[in-house]
UniProtKB/Swiss-Prot annotation:
Modified residues (Phosphothreonine): T1945
An individual GO BP term: regulation of small GTPase mediated signal transduction
Protein name: Probable Rho GTPase-activating protein CG5521
Biased composition regions of type Basic and acidic residues, renumbered to the chain: 758-774
Key word rRNA-binding present: no
Annotated S-S bridges: none
Keywords: GTPase activation, Phosphoprotein
Feature: compositional bias, Polar residues: 788-800, 1546-1568
Length: 1958
């Protein structure tokens, strides 16, 4: 499109250019045209050929333009000047060779002077500076002096002092002019260049401004900053502009180097007088910076320094150059201007890097940046720039040449941005000029020197005080202006972050590490001290740099310190300085906070590397959790500490490692530390692409072992001195000294190397899966990539600078920097064995990273970094330190507790040889106790720490005197807070169970302090009232033989012994007062429980033990028989009554938990009822008090908690009534003759009836007993059931339950008082007899035998010798007539004349089931020898009348044979005679003597009234009766003479349903079996029923028949299964020494002798196969042969003893585990040296865990661990010390109360009597049969007539085809009155006409006969009575299993199964 002109045109223009006749303007125009149409080389040739013409044109046009501009400034004139300047630039650029020889030097200097005039416009002057620099660099060193002077004036306002005499060639002197040959003419002094008017040469005109500034341009005074900026920019713009003929690139660089050198020589000393040219990075001077002040004079030129810094950073900042290169190379048609600009930048950078002087200049410029004073915004930005440059140098991929090591090969060619450079930008000549010589190696200073220089120089930003500067800087937010302090703070944060980047990511040598440490120490010391002392005391922390950055500075210092010791050996003198600095700054809270973070993190690493335990993922926290299995499948790094058992790489291993790291990274971060997944030095908001650093691999990858830097730098601190712990512990064991190891000194560690195999070394995450040297590098690189892309490796700092706010959120990732800590170098060798032999750096070896020895040493050193913590001046910081020490100690305790934990819970691991130094800080604790009162808070923490050490057994024999002395002084001192702290943290009785040598010396001190606390009114959660009560309670029940009489005298200043024989009496007084007036609920409960224990012990041991040997080590109170009485000579403690009265008074407490605890404590004594009876009036006191408490606790609207209290009281009352001997209960105790039984029944009746009291019951008067609780600290525990609100329904439920309990207790007492246990034993309260027992012999003559455990009982349903009654709503009676049973010796009727049948009555009620066998008694043995003569006759003609059966004697005389007295004679008793009727005579006497009493219609009182019937009617009735009598006599005679089948009439024709042949056969057989008796099968039962008065009309409303059916029998079986007592089942587990896993514990088949004694004392052994009581779900076979069992009249307990159950197979182990795991209460006997844990036998149950630990002194430590939802219970509290005499009793009572409390807390839980009552109600509501009196009487006469029997048989026969729905719909329908049909059928035979009523009933039955029985389908429902295989005493049978028995098996009840408790 555009073309240049032809060659001919160029020639024409050239000719015109050379034509001197043309005007200069035309020639200039032709010259421009020529240059526009030729190449640059041709242009240069043109200029060189016509240089004279060209310069003439320049000068002429310039002079013309100057002249025109002087006249008037016009646009055309400015254009003329622009053309001249264009030509000037062309001459300067194209003729450098001529100009270098000073061609036209003077002329050009005049032009330049005019252009540089200060009066010119700024634009023109900038152009002039550029032209001058082009000319000046061309002249170079050949420039004359005046040119150099012109250069010195380039910056206006900057005065450059003249440096002495100017050189001889710079100017011409006057003499030179005069002596010059040209100045002389012929014979005279005249000259053309000489003015004759004057005597001197011609002078040049004055230089004036060419183009003054316009009015729009400001005429401000010149600013040196602007001039310097113009100069520096022009230096860059003029670079590479000269077109040299040869060696252009070299000359370009030389030209710029000249300008730069001139700049440094001329201007730099002027505006930066502090610029130190002697500073060198090749031999750096590393003097530590000091505090500096702000000099106002220096601030004047600071802006110029800022300009220089910004200018240098443009060419040394890698990122800026990369940006230019990227922009240039991505454009195809590169613009020459842009390309030229890029070349200029490269030239500048190359010149800056070309030699050492220039490189030093660059670093000195940046040093000046760090010395700026934050007084302006540009200064702040310059500092930021300097920091960014150094950061990019350290992290960039292409380092500058001075960063390269002098001996290393140059790095592979690559540019900063990652894009290959174009080769055309680097010509061969350029490469040869710059990098082709050995000079390039000279500039290499090495990375370490640069790092040292930066570390030293950058510290200057901290060392200037800007807090007093009253300056504000604008920000992006218009509403906020920042201050110099804020800006300095941000800059310091950036420097700290760069320091951290170096620590984390940069390889540094020893000198660099030490310099960094020294600089940080200097900064820490100066900044924090300076801010502390120069500001007023009340200054806010945010007003000082140290206050803002104190935490960050301390953290950086500490982390760098620890990191350095894992990388390089550090001079010991630095440690001393470090300690001095930290100790001098202990008044700063930031130091304490960071020190604590360091210690806590070091403790984690210490735990991980030394003991193989991750504190953030403890083994105890993982046990018994499902997630633990997943973690174990992934693999725990810490378990194979010295092995090489990890997976061999691969993706699975990498994924596992990544997951572990991510979990640890998240877990170890705290709220104050932000964990970032990609950066361990967090720099938020500026993400940087991830780079893999070759330096992080150690700088090389050629055969050497790579040292992982970047990915390994993210671990946490660790704690230590444990390499020595193993060795020292072995030494102590050899010397038989205390087993607690102590850390050795580092010198000892260095001298005595331990065996590497003894250390449990933990391999790092990145050192997994390495087998040999061949795989080493790849494995590491995999680890690096994993770490970099994952979560734990620190990335480089962000690309665009560090955010100022990152420090606060970052905290240097102290966990990360120490937790990883190059541990890979520890496990990165060819195998673990080779690595374990290497010594760590801190011990003088070469192994980097964390090792057990390095972690232990570093942990101990950092622990002591603060020096003596008791010298901390501030009390609050002193307390804070001890609080942190306590946290650290608790972590050490966790480590100890988690050592040797089995991961699979199948085998117990041996204890490791290393033990954490728990007591390492004990000396500090003792020292703190001697401080003054202002340090009280710290002393409290120290006391807690000491007590924790004592509890953990970390107080050795050497420390015990100090420990006792400290406790003695504090316990007897005046400071109650310290006293309370000791009592609280000694954990009450835990101190007694520790068995510390000589601990009994402190008993009186403890009692004294406890009395002070309990008598105080201070009630809060921090006051240890409960712990003190438990301690005193344990001492109260302490065996006197173990209490030494010598104790310390309770005075603070004395340490003397005294005798105290009455210590326990003193304790008893305190406990009694606590039980009476304690304001804390929990302490009151504990005191009451301890009083109960004391009572039990005193009743069990009435006399003190005469011998104190081991004979009394373990005495148990085994339950004894009721006939065993205590010795009469027993003497009981006289204070038993006083203690009893306190317990009885507590029964009236309205606080429900306290009342229940009092009940439980009192119930302990119920087992000692006979001992209590031996004490005068104690039984009356107890019974009366309980009855009174019942009345007081009764409320009109009870809640669930009231119900629990009242039921507990009533059951306790029942227990005492059963325990106290019956004679005492039946003995009157007052004048009215009331007995205790009467009083009890009266109260129970009142409760059961719910009768309101007419008078208010008042509490028992006791002025010393406080019924109020000021502090209910039981709120946090589980609560008794309590509804949020009450409704009438909930109130009624509670009332019903309370009444039912009273009824059950009263019935129990009526039945069992004086009889328990009966002959069957204590395991059975109810009869085991059932309806089917002995029926087979009675009904079938022995042909068919029914079995007890059979559910298929059709014979029971159809038996005619049995009837079921409901005598009232809660009483079901079964009357069964049986043949007289043959008993050994004749039984109770031996020798008496009885009938050959007996009556069995089974009664089921709330109290259980009772069985009574009754026989009719005819005569005594003497009468039986002479039987009456009428006996044979009666036997053959005995009527069916039930009353006649008893007439075995002569009938009395008839009524009319009696004599009568005269009417006026008074019948007296002395005149009685057998034939006189006293009542008849009395009536006659009254009527005779008092006629007014005789009615008008009656003549006398003893005469009958007139009959309402007529005489005929009376005669008719008499006739019917006589006929009936005659018929009966004939029937008897007929049946006796002809013994035919009695029920022959059943086969007669009838319209009713006929019975089947089976029923006829069974009925016939039943009568044939009685050949000697012909009475009905139910005859004697009917007789007894009448004798008992049950047949009377007055009882008709309460007595009902029950519908006989199989469902009823099942319901009765269900009633029998309901327990009549409270039942509990508990697990008993034995843990032998060395057992801590489930497998070994469950495999125990026996225990120690003490354990066996304990188990035997819990109850008595029962045989599971023959036991007839509660079994707790144990099968009779398969779970052992015996089990311990215990029973009282109101409860049963069975123990699932693990050692009794077999464990020889996996099935047996599974069964054992199920039985034990399903128990709610576990009793564990542990002889292991560590505490038993719940997770050893994991289960969803085990709500309460009771563990017994035998102690060496014969006592037992008991811990009670309950789940949070379980309410408080007694008598044993957690951490109790109990003697062996009452151990089993207390454990049993505690376990029972625990089970009872757990159940009471369950919603909708019902007691045993409620369950039984519900079953009885179910029977009465479902099966009660409403009948008329006639029907009722008939069913008594004949329980099962043939009609009913047939109907029942037919319904059973047809049941197989009927659906279940019919049974569900019709099961409540009334049965057919079959007995009516039987009487009708028997009418013709008997000769009796059926009555009308009987006929109508029969007709009704006939009409409904076919539909009366509801058919039932064959489906069976799962019910509690489902047929199962059961063990019978004679043989083992299976019911309902065969096919043949299917027809006789009745269907199961369609009702749903009821809930059962076993």
């Amino acid at each position: 499109m555009f073309t240049k002109k032809s060659h001919a045109d160029v020639k024409k223009s050239t000719a015109k250019l050379q034509d001197s006749k043309k005007d200069s303007a035309s020639r200039l125009r032709h010259l421009r045209m020529i240059l526009d149409n030729v190449e640059l080389e041709e242009s240069k040739c043109l200029f060189e050929t016509n240089y004279s013409h060209v310069y003439f044109i320049l000068y002429d046009t310039f002079i013309q333009a100057e002249a025109n501009l002087k006249q008037k400034v016009h646009k055309a004139h400015r254009e003329e000047l622009d053309g001249s300047l264009w030509l000037l630039e062309k001459i300067l650029c194209l003729l450098p060779e001529l100009l270098a020889r000073r061609w036209q030097c003077h002329s050009l200097s005049r032009i330049m002077a005019k252009l540089l005039h200060l009066g010119n416009s700024p634009k023109l002057r900038r152009e002039g500076v550029r032209y001058f620099l082009l000319w000046y660099q061309t002249l170079g060193e050949n420039a004359p002096g005046y040119v150099h002077a012109m250069y010195a004036d380039l910056i206006p306002g900057l005065i450059v002092p003249q440096k002495g005499v100017v050189g001889p060639d710079t100017e011409f002197s006057a003499s030179d002019f005069l002596t010059h040959p040209n100045m002389k003419a012929d014979g005279g002094m005249a000259s053309v260049f000489h003015d004759n008017a004057f005597s001197h040469p011609v002078q040049s005109s004055e230089v004036v401004a060419l183009l003054p500034p316009s009015s729009s341009e400001k005429s401000a005074p010149p600013d040196p900053r602007d001039g310097l900026e113009v100069l520096l920019n022009s230096m860059v713009h003029t670079a590479a502009c000269l077109r040299w003929r040869d060696n252009r690139a070299q000359k370009d660089h030389r030209a710029f180097a000249f300008l730069l050198q001139r700049f440094m020589d001329v201007f730099l000393p002027v505006f930066s007088p502090n610029f130190d040219v002697s500073c060198s990075i090749y031999n750096p001077r590393l003097d530590l910076p000091v505090m500096r002040s702000i000099n106002k004079k220096e601030e004047v030129m600071a802006s110029c320094v800022v300009v220089l810094i910004n200018w240098v950073s443009r060419f040394t900042h890698e990122r800026l150059l990369s940006h230019r290169l990227d922009c240039t190379l991505h454009i195809e048609d590169v613009d020459q201007v842009r390309l030229h600009g890029y070349q200029q930048g490269l030239i500048v950078r190359d010149v800056l890097y070309v030699n050492r002087e220039n490189i030093n200049f660059v670093h000195e410029v940046y040093r000046q940046a760090f010395l700026l004073n934050f007084t302006s915004k540009p200064q702040i930005e310059a500092i930021r720039t300097a920091i960014a440059v150094y950061r990019d140098w350290m992290t960039g991929e292409t380092p500058p040449p001075f960063l390269l090591e002098p001996n290393d090969d140059p790095p592979p060619p690559s540019n900063a941005g990652g894009t290959p450079r174009s080769q055309r930008l680097r010509t061969p000549s350029y490469v040869g000029a710059i990098a082709g010589s050995k000079d390039q190696l000279v500039v290499r200073a090495g990375r370490q020197n640069v790092l040292q220089v930066f570390v030293t120089n950058a510290a200057n930003v901290f060392l200037v005080n800007t807090a007093n500067l009253n300056i504000c800087f604008p920000t992006r937010s218009r509403s906020y202006r920042s201050t110099p302090l804020e800006e300095q703070t941000e800059i310091c944060k950036k420097v700290l972050n760069v320091y951290r980047t170096m620590v984390m990511n940069t390889e540094m040598d020893t000198r660099t590490w030490e310099q960094l440490l020294m600089v940080l120490l200097q900064v820490t010391s100066i900044v924090l001290h300076q801010n502390q002392h120069t500001l007023p005391s009340g200054t806010n922390k945010s007003a000082t740099l140290g206050g803002i950055l104190g935490s960050a500075i301390f953290q950086t210092l500490i982390v760098t310190w620890i990191r350095a010791h894992t990388k390089v050996p550090v001079n010991v003198l630095l440690w001393e300085k470090f300690l001095n600095v930290l100790q001098s700054l202990t008044h700063r809270e930031e130091l304490i906070i960071e020190w604590n973070k360091t210690i806590q993190t070091l403790t984690r690493v210490f735990s991980r590397y030394t003991y193989g335990i991750n504190l953030l993922d403890l083994p105890l926290d993982r046990v018994a959790e499902s997630r633990a299995e997943k973690r174990r499948r992934i693999g725990s790094v810490w378990q194979g500490s010295g092995s090489n058992s990890a997976a061999n790489g691969g993706s699975a291993a990498s994924a596992a490692i990544s997951q572990n790291r991510q979990r640890e990274s998240l877990a170890e971060s705290s709220s104050s530390r932000s964990e970032e997944t990609s950066s361990q030095v967090p720099l938020p908001n500026h993400p940087r692409p991830h780079h893999q650093h070759t330096q992080s691999q150690g700088g090389t990858g050629h055969g050497t072992r790579p040292i992982p830097l970047t990915p390994m730098l993210s671990r946490s601190y660790s704690e230590g001195s444990l390499a020595s712990a193993a060795r020292s512990s072995r030494i102590r064991r050899r010397r038989a000294a205390t087993p607690k190891p102590k850390a050795l000194q580092p010198s000892q560690l260095a001298e005595n190397r331990i065996n590497p195999q003894d250390l449990r070394r933990a391999m790092s995450l990145d050192s997994l899966a390495r087998k040999g040297d061949a795989e080493e590098t790849d494995s590491y690189q995999e680890g690096d990539n994993e770490s970099g892309a994952g979560s734990r490796s620190p990335s480089p700092t962000a690309s665009s600078g560090i955010e100022g706010g990152s420090i606060k959120d970052a905290q240097l990732q102290i966990d990360a920097s120490l937790d990883d800590a190059n541990s890979g170098s520890y496990g990165s060798g060819s195998n673990s064995g080779s690595i374990s032999g290497r010594r760590c750096i801190i011990l003088g070896g070469s192994a980097e990273g964390w090792h057990p020895d390095s972690t232990s040493i570093m942990w101990k050193r950092m622990l002591g970094a603060l020096g003596d913590v008791n010298r901390i001046p501030k009390a609050d910081l002193h307390a804070q330190v001890f609080m942190h020490l306590l946290e650290m100690t608790q972590n050490l305790i966790k480590i100890k507790q988690n050592q040797g934990i089995s991961t699979d819970n199948q085998n117990t691991q041996p204890m490791p040889p290393l033990v954490p130094p728990i007591g390492i800080v004990a000396p500090w604790c003792y020292g703190s106790l001697s401080l003054d009162r202002s340090f009280k808070k710290g002393k409290l923490w120290a006391l807690q720490l000491l007590c924790s050490l004592a509890i953990q057994g970390a107080v050795n024999m050497q420390q015990l005197p100090l420990f006792y002395h400290a406790l003695h002084q504090l316990l007897t001192g005046e400071d109650r807070d310290l006293i309370y702290a000791i009592l609280k943290h000694l954990e009450g009785p835990r101190l007694l169970s520790l068995l510390l040598p000589g601990h009994t010396l402190l008993l009186l001190d403890l009692v004294h302090a406890s009395a002070i606390l309990l008598t105080s009114l201070e009630v809060s959660r921090s006051t240890p009232r409960a712990e003190v009560a438990a301690l005193l309670g344990s001492l109260l029940c302490y065996p006197s033989s173990l209490l030494t009489r010598s104790v310390l005298q309770p005075t603070p200043q004395k340490f003397e012994l005294m005798e105290c024989s009455d210590l326990q009496d003193h304790i008893l007084n305190i406990v009694l007062r606590c039980a009476r007036r304690e304001p804390s609920a929990k302490a009151r409960c504990i005191a009451l429980s301890q009083l109960g224990q004391w009572l039990l012990m005193r009743l069990s041991q009435p006399l003190p033990a005469s011998n104190s040997g081991r004979a009394n080590l373990f005495q148990q109170a085994v339950p004894h028989h009721k006939d065993v009485h205590p010795k009469a000579s027993s003497v009981y403690n006289p204070r038993i009554k006083e203690v009893l009265q306190v317990l009885l008074q507590a029964l009236q407490f309205k606080h429900h938990t306290i009342a229940i605890v009092a009940v439980d404590s009192l119930k302990l004594c119920a087992e000692r009822g006979r001992q209590l009876a031996a004490i005068e009036r104690v039984p009356q006191l107890i019974i009366t008090a309980i009855c009174k408490a019942l009345e007081i606790q009764s409320v009109t609207k009870p809640k669930d908690s009231d119900k629990v209290v009242l039921t507990s009281l009533m059951l306790c009352l029942g227990e005492f009534c059963m325990a106290i001997p019956a004679p005492i209960m039946l003995t009157p105790f007052n004048e009215q003759g009331d007995t205790l039984v009467l009083q009890v029944l009266r109260v129970l009746l009142q409760v059961a009836s719910g009768a309101p009291r007419h008078e208010r019951v008042k509490l028992t008067a006791d002025d010393d007993f406080d019924m109020h609780i000021a502090h209910d600290d039981l709120q946090g525990d589980g609560r008794l059931p309590e509804a949020t609100y009450q409704t009438s329904e909930t109130i009624q439920k509670c009332i019903t339950a309370i009444k039912l309990c009273a009824k059950a207790v009263s019935m129990h007492l009526v039945t069992h008082i004086g009889h328990f246990p009966m002959g069957i034993g204590a395991s059975r309260l109810s009869s085991m007899v059932e309806e089917q027992d002995d029926i087979g012999n009675a009904a079938y003559g022995g042909q068919v035998e029914t079995r007890r455990d059979s559910v298929e009982l059709p014979s029971v349903v159809s038996a005619q010798n049995m009837q079921l009654f409901m005598l009232n709503s809660g009483l079901v009676a079964s009357f069964i007539e049986l043949p007289t049973l043959k008993l050994p010796g004749g039984g109770i009727t031996a020798g008496l004349v009885t009938a050959d049948k007996q009556v069995r009555v089974l009664m089921r009620d709330l109290n259980g089931k009772a069985c009574w066998d009754a026989s009719i008694l005819y005569s005594e043995p003497r009468n039986a020898e002479e039987p009456p003569k009428t006996t044979p006759k009666i036997q053959h003609s005995q009527p069916l009348d039930s009353m006649a059966t008893s007439m075995v004697t002569h009938t009395p005389s008839p009524r009319h044979t009696l004599r009568h007295r005269p009417a006026g004679v008074l019948p007296l008793a002395k005149d009685m005679a057998p034939d006189l009727d006293q009542l008849d005579d009395m009536l006659a006497y009254i009527g005779h003597t008092s006629p007014e009493c005789v009615a008008p219609t009656v003549s006398q009182l003893n005469a009958p009234t007139a009959s309402p019937l007529s005489g005929n009617q009376e005669a008719q009735a008499i006739s019917v009766i006589l006929n009936q009598r005659l018929l009966e006599q004939e029937f008897v005679t007929h049946s006796t003479q002809a013994p035919s089948p009695a029920l022959r009439h059943a086969s007669s024709n009838s319209s009713l349903q006929q019975p089947d042949q089976r029923s006829l056969h069974s009925t016939t057989a039943s009568f044939d079996s009685l050949p000697t008796r012909t009475e009905m099968p139910f005859q004697y039962c009917r007789l007894l029923f009448s004798h008992l008065g049950l047949a009377g009309w007055e009882r008709r409303s309460r007595t009902h028949l029950l519908q006989r059916s199989e469902k009823l029998m099942r319901e009765l079986r269900n009633v029998d299964l309901q327990k009549c007592r409270e039942t509990h089942k508990m697990a008993v587990i034995y843990v032998a020494a060395g057992q801590e896993d489930k497998g070994s514990i469950l495999r125990n088949t026996s225990g120690s002798s003490t354990y066996e004694m304990f188990v035997s004392a819990l109850g008595w052994e029962i045989d599971l196969e023959t036991h007839n009581g509660f079994l707790g779900g144990l099968p009779r076979q398969g779970c052992g042969a015996t089990a311990p069992y215990y029973a009282t009249p109101f409860l049963e307990v069975v123990y699932h003893v693990a050692t009794r159950m077999p464990s020889d197979s996996s099935e047996a182990m599974l069964l054992k585990t199920r039985h034990l795991g399903n128990d709610e209460v576990h009793i564990v006997w542990s002889e292991h040296n560590r505490d038993y844990r719940r997770d050893i036998l994991p289960t969803e149950f085990c709500d309460v865990l009771i563990v017994v630990y035998p102690l060496r002194n014969g006592l037992f430590r008991v811990t009670v661990n309950r789940k949070p939802e379980v309410p408080w219970f007694g008598p044993l509290a957690n951490e109790s010390v109990v003697s062996g005499a009452c151990l089993a009793t207390l454990i049993r009572a505690t376990a029972i109360n625990a089970s009872r409390t757990k159940r009471a807390a369950l919603p909708l839980y019902q007691q045993f009597y409620e369950e039984r009552n519900r079953s009885l109600d179910s029977v009465s509501s479902r099966y009660k049969e409403s009948t008329t009196f006639e029907d009722f009487a008939s069913r008594i006469y004949n329980p099962m007539p043939l009609s009913t029997l047939g109907t029942l048989r037919e319904s059973n026969a047809s049941s197989s085809a009927a659906p279940l729905a019919s049974a569900l719909l019709d099961h409540n329908r009334a049965s057919v009155k079959g007995w009516v049909q039987a009487s009708i059928d028997s009418g013709p035979i008997m000769g009796i006409a059926p009555s009308a009523s009987a006929g109508s009933t029969a007709a009704m039955e006939a009409a409904t006969g076919m539909s009366s029985a509801s058919p039932r389908g064959p489906r069976k429902l799962g019910a509690p009575f489902k047929s199962v295989t059961k063990k019978h005493s004679l043989q083992h049978i299976a019911v309902g299993g065969g096919a043949g028995a299917g027809g006789d098996t009745p269907p199961e009840s369609p009702t749903l199964p009821q809930r059962r408790f076993k």
